[in-house]
């Protein structure tokens, strides 16, 4: 009974992990001010002009309450 020789082990390319978080340009629904916020924010981000809450933390990704204009990164 002959066994086949073991196949050579192929190494996979090491993938560089990339962050899933992004910076977002968000427009305030109340006054229209545009502001950059973090997508995984751990605190409430308020509009610098009117004080309206733009981002609420949820324990992971933050809930974005304004309109997302652009995604950076």
Swiss-Prot record:
Q: Zinc finger regions typed C4-type: which residues?
A: 28-50
Q: Identify the keywords attached in UniProt to this record, alphabetized.
A: Metal-binding, Ribonucleoprotein, Ribosomal protein, Zinc, Zinc-finger
A molecular function annotated in GO for this UniProt entry is:
zinc ion binding
| Coiled coil location | none
Q: One GO BP annotation here?
A: translation
Residues recorded as binding Zn(2+), renumbered to this chain, are 28, 31, 47, 50
Q: What is this protein called?
A: Small ribosomal subunit protein eS27
Disulfide bridge partners, by residue number: none
| Family per similarity comment | Belongs to the eukaryotic ribosomal protein eS27 family.
Protein's UniProt keywords contain Zinc-finger = yes
Specify whether Zinc-finger is a keyword of the entry: yes
List the Gene3D superfamilies hit by this protein, alphabetically.
Zn-binding ribosomal proteins
According to its UniProt entry, this protein's organism is Aeropyrum pernix (strain ATCC 700893 / DSM 11879 / JCM 9820 / NBRC 100138 / K1)
Q: Which cofactor does it need?
A: Zn(2+)
Offer one Pfam family short name for this entry.
Ribosomal_S27e
Its organism's taxonomic lineage begins at: Archaea, Thermoproteota, Thermoprotei, Desulfurococcales, Desulfurococcaceae
Cofactor mode of binding and number, as noted: Binds 1 zinc ion per subunit.
Q: Which InterPro entries match?
A: Ribosomal_eS27, Ribosomal_eS27_Zn-bd_dom_sf, Ribosomal_zn-bd
User: What's a single GO CC term here?
Assistant: ribonucleoprotein complex
Quaternary structure, from the entry = Part of the 30S ribosomal subunit.
């Amino acid at each position: 009974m002959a066994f086949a020789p073991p196949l050579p082990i192929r190494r996979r390319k090491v993938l560089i992990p990339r962050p899933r978080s992004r910076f977002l340009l968000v427009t305030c629904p109340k006054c229209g001010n545009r502001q950059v916020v973090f997508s995984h924010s751990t605190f409430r981000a308020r509009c610098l002009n009117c004080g309206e809450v733009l981002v609420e933390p949820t324990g992971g990704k933050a809930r974005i309450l304004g309109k997302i204009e652009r995604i950076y990164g």
